[in-house]
Amino acid sequence: MLGTTEADLFVTPEMIESGEKTALYKGCIEWSEKTEELWGQPSYVYYFKRHLPGDDWGAFHCAELWYMFGTLDRCWRPWEEHDRKLSEDMLNYWTHFMRTGKPTDGDDWKPCTKENPYVKEFE
C-alpha cells in the first residue's frame, strides 16, 4: 500500500490547477506494476486530495497521516464531520489491510495492476 498527496513534494500550483499527475503519483503506479511483475503480489495505491481545514496549503506532503492514524484531535485544525468520516474510513482500510493483506473485501479499492492501474482517491 502506497500513495501520494495532491500537493506533495515538487508539485506546483499550476500542476494542481491543470490536474497534471506528478512523478510521485506515476512512480507509485510504476512501483505497483513492478511489484506485481516481480513477486506476483497485489499493491494498493492511494491519492489523498482532501484540503485540510484551517489554511490554504491544500493536501500537502504527509497531510493524510492525521487521518490514517486517527489522530485528528491532536491537531489544532477545525475539523469537520467529513474529516472524521474520512479518517474512520481510512483507519478501516489500513486495519483491514494489516489483517488480510488487502484494504477491503469489497470492490471499492482494487489492486493497481498493469491491466487496471487503479488508484483510490481520498477527498
Which sequence ranges carry the predicted segments?
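C-terminal helix-and-tail extensions that cap enzymatic domains
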Residues: 2-123
